[in-house]
Amino acid sequence: VALIAGGVGITPIRALLEDMPGAPGDIAVVYRSARAAEVILRDELDELAARRGAEIHYLIGEPRSPSGDDLRALVPDIADRHVYVCGSTEMTRATRATLRRDGVPAAQITTEGFSL
């Protein structure tokens, strides 16, 4: 499983990290925030990831063009995972397109987009 969050989209992703079944190493979290000061729940996420044996990656800064290079570098087997994405509508749309280009079947992608 891969959990991908943008900004405050980490809130539902955090709940999935806590409750989702999986053995150590089965869950990867990728959390993008425009600025380091805007990363929320970091201590809690780090503790949960350590307890669950999950990988967690923080990407700080505005994303460049939607490219899967960074994502594949962080989660090389992304095409074999079910991917949950939560963030702005624009972010979830771009991430879904990137995942599809990277070979993730549509049935393995679940998104929740929102606008503020």
Each language-model region and where it sits:
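FNR/FR-type flavoprotein reductase catalytic core
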Residues: 1-116
